[in-house]
């Protein structure tokens, strides 16, 4: 038992130093930290203790061979030279975990196959039975590590990964591994014997790990399946001694100072069952509660609050998360004065929404996500004012005050005007302040924040934080519910991505615009269904269309068609390449009671349809994209380059006294007057007449022209 052997404990990156300390405490081992784990020297009892007691190690490996190889032949020769009969019986199943590559062995599956071949061939040459490979639960697991020419072959004494404690039946959404939960608790600064609160406990892993620490329950006490069970070097007597010592160290005389809260009663039920399985159900108080109503369960004691709040990988979840973290920060100040707080998040910028100053921070990985854990000390003074109001907390922690003040000012001006104009959809803010490069639009009782893509010179994290601040301030100023705020990142459109779905919520509602009802969808597409800056253009087109035949080319969702039809157009024709948007246009017609044979919809490449058109129209509205290279179009389209080609075709189908309303959003667009004259057309720039009050800050957002035959 006194023979000293060097083992290797693997760990997630960033855990190594704490694992070294833990191993010293468990078995007195002298450890050496390397990336991905700790080499530690101990006897066999110490190895068993490490397997049973470690909360941070992923696996414990017993190295068999360490050598240099250059090819798969070297690998095979090394494996077949190992005396496998001294390690396991050929009647036992085995499996090979192969990690790493080099110039010759470029695939881990190939490497694992060569190791497997070497082991099988060894036994067959010794005239033993051929051992069977079992991927799911092998008796023996061989671990192979290859880094360039360095090869290490080890016996995995763990069997299954050590984060699998056995108490979790259902992990729910986005679970924390038990090893990660343990290190979060250890890094939080929590002291045994003091209260520990998790206000968003989910499946309860943080609290269960801490409660087991407090109760002296070793993490692997319930495990039956081990990687050493079939190992010929296993010493059952020593193992039994280690087990008995582990059982004897349980502490049953401890106070139940663990508190778990969660809004979801189903998740809470799973947490309770997990705690029961882990043997700590009697130590943890569970309660269904909303974070907005979070109360300190131990006002007469100082303790630690630790949590892993939800975080979304999709940007669309951000407004709700910002509100969650903001309210969370307020409740911490109100209820947990003098406490230690430790929050772990996969979206580090959300931690800034807590409006707390951290004392320490730690990086960690949760699967592929780069995460951050921040520790805070809540100021003592707040405990003397437990009845501080939420509004005063919000005022004291107001974010982006310049942005908030400008938004408030704009709302007072624009909403009064919008009410007079019978408008439900309008712009409230349009990058008024350079450092807050956003647009804020109201659609009835919803708000859409469009972030203009930041230039490359702006640090991504800084732009992201300003975006979060803007969302927080907008929620505060407008008072809307978080589920009615939509966040979008506006980038340069490439090809057809204006038609691509961003989500699939299917949430439509209609807005009023000068008496027209128009369906909008704020989440599923890059655009919402109406272009707000063209509002006056649509109104003007409607007034011009009375008693006329009307063509809406590049019709989008048909909003201009609705205005034309409501104002008494004789007949309307709407053409767009997107079937999605034409269906939308059809729904708009139906919503306004306009569905009839006089209002036709065509799904087609607009330019191709135009070339084949034999009808003539008295009023044509054309609002083409700035650029398009859609696969559904025969050629690419550039409005600056191709607008005369477009006018050539439009003139052919325009009646002698007809008019074309031509608009586009290309900044710096230059009308080719000579080209128009050669066609017998003349253009009048009416852009200034079509710019509504809420877009006055950006007079170049679109340009608009009325084009006629010269003789008219």
From Swiss-Prot:
EC number per UniProt: 2.1.1.173, 2.1.1.264
Domain THUMP: 46-157
GO molecular function, one term: RNA binding
Gene3D superfamilies: 3.30.2130.30, RNA methyltransferase domain (HRMD) like, Vaccinia Virus protein VP39
Subcellular localization, as worded in the UniProt entry: Cytoplasm
Keywords annotated in UniProt: Cytoplasm, Methyltransferase, RNA-binding, rRNA processing, S-adenosyl-L-methionine, Transferase
Enzyme class, UniProt record, top EC level: transferase
Top-rank lineage group of the source organism: Bacteria
Catalytic activity: guanosine(2445) in 23S rRNA + S-adenosyl-L-methionine = N(2)-methylguanosine(2445) in 23S rRNA + S-adenosyl-L-homocysteine + H(+); guanosine(2069) in 23S rRNA + S-adenosyl-L-methionine = N(2)-methylguanosine(2069) in 23S rRNA + S-adenosyl-L-homocysteine + H(+)
Similarity comment: family membership: Belongs to the methyltransferase superfamily. RlmKL family.
Function, as annotated: Specifically methylates the guanine in position 2445 (m2G2445) and the guanine in position 2069 (m7G2069) of 23S rRNA.
Classification via PANTHER family: RIBOSOMAL RNA LARGE SUBUNIT METHYLTRANSFERASE K/L, RIBOSOMAL RNA LARGE SUBUNIT METHYLTRANSFERASE K_L
Protein name, per record: Ribosomal RNA large subunit methyltransferase K/L
Species of origin: Haemophilus ducreyi (strain 35000HP / ATCC 700724)
Encoding gene per record: rlmL
